[in-house]
Regions:
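Duplex nucleic acid-engaging cores and interfaces of nucleic-acid transaction enzymes
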Residues: 1-133
Length: 133
């Protein structure tokens, strides 16, 4: 799908829409303006990177494993951890568990609770031909 003019990329995986922020201000808009509380949110643990949102219109409690892993791979790819040779830790939680305290810079957030997955960074075009730009 085309995402020109928006502050995020869009990728489809097994019927789920994955949205990938393009920068700090766009990450904030994606997480706090576009995403719904029941959507899933991912970000590489530690280094700077894109906010990744997996839409959850059905309100499932857990993402299918293939969707979770693919979204985590994309989050790792769109981060400073991209060049890592090993697996990268990615935090995953509900958007409802992401908050932005007053005074935090664009793109910076705190998580109330999260799980972590470890994946290799892989570009989104491996899934559907998205150019990532």
């Amino acid at each position: 799908m085309s995402s020109k003019g928006r502050g995020y990329r869009e990728v489809e995986v097994s019927g789920y829409t994955i949205l990938v922020g393009r920068g700090d201000a766009e990450n904030d808009r994606l997480t706090f303006g576009v995403a719904e509380p029941r959507d899933f949110w991912l970000h590489v643990a530690g280094p700077a990177g894109s906010h990744v949102v997996v839409r959850n219109p059905e309100g499932v409690d857990e993402l299918p494993r293939d969707v979770l892993e693919r979204a985590a791979e994309i989050a790792a790819w769109h981060s400073k951890a991209r060049g890592s040779r090993g697996k990268v830790e990615v935090h995953v939680c509900r958007v409802a568990d992401v908050r932005k305290p007053r005074g935090f810079a664009p793109g910076q957030v705190l998580l109330k609770r999260w799980d972590a997955v470890r994946v290799y960074a892989k570009p989104s075009e491996e899934t559907n031909g998205d150019s990532g730009g």
